[in-house]
Amino acid sequence: MTRSHNHSATITTARFDQARAEAAVRELLIAVGEDPDREGLRDTPARVARAYQEIFAGLYTDPDEVLKTMFDEQHDEMVLVKDIPMYSTCEHHLVSFHGVAHVGYIPGVDGRVTGLSKLARVVDLYAKRPQVQERLTGQIADALMRRLDPRGVIVVIEAEHLCMAMRGIRKPGAVTTTSAVRGQFKTDKASRAEALDLILRK
């Protein structure tokens, strides 16, 4: 498997190996003491493999490609999309963490913007891979800085981690908040405060 490390995305050129994934799930069922040939589990390896192909679909698509389309709107004020539903997978335990992402940017001097759905799509593609929330937040911000050439970017993610809710410390409902600020949002306190006020306002 070859990977590109030319930016913070991790993209694989390999295709999803359905047969290998099915075999791995079957072995896991045996390892925990189950019978993978009993009626309820007979098709489970194939179902789980297909599910993981979807859950990790972001490994096979470069999020930068999503941001190629730009529109000349001569817009010089903040663009913010709030409460983007987000599902990802903790790379430490391979269980879900889920919540919402808030993504904002100030267009560059050329006033060009990208489609609002593209921001949600970038969140989705970075989330659909083995992740940690801190890295996910930064990757989204860096992709926007890299492709949109904006004056500033802010990304805030609020998520519940099932690895904290289902096992270990077992604290369901605990929410982890991470942020990444770039450009003007990092250097200008007023811009950052305005963005955070809009994000926190319900």
UniProtKB/Swiss-Prot annotation:
GO terms for cellular component: cytoplasm. GO terms for molecular function: GTP binding; GTP cyclohydrolase I activity; zinc ion binding. Its EC number is 3.5.4.16. It holds the Pfam family GTP_cyclohydroI. It comes from the Bacteria. Keywords: GTP-binding, Hydrolase, Metal-binding, Nucleotide-binding, One-carbon metabolism, Zinc. Zn(2+) binds at residues 90, 93, 163. Pathway: Cofactor biosynthesis; 7,8-dihydroneopterin triphosphate biosynthesis; 7,8-dihydroneopterin triphosphate from GTP: step 1/1. It is an enzyme of class 3 (hydrolase). GO terms for biological process: one-carbon metabolic process; tetrahydrobiopterin biosynthetic process; tetrahydrofolate biosynthetic process. Coiled coil: none annotated. It catalyses: GTP + H2O = 7,8-dihydroneopterin 3'-triphosphate + formate + H(+). PROSITE patterns: GTP_CYCLOHYDROL_1_1, GTP_CYCLOHYDROL_1_2. Belongs to the GTP cyclohydrolase I family. Toroid-shaped homodecamer, composed of two pentamers of five dimers. This is GTP cyclohydrolase 1. It comes from Mycolicibacterium vanbaalenii (strain DSM 7251 / JCM 13017 / BCRC 16820 / KCTC 9966 / NRRL B-24157 / PYR-1) (Mycobacterium vanbaalenii). The gene is folE.
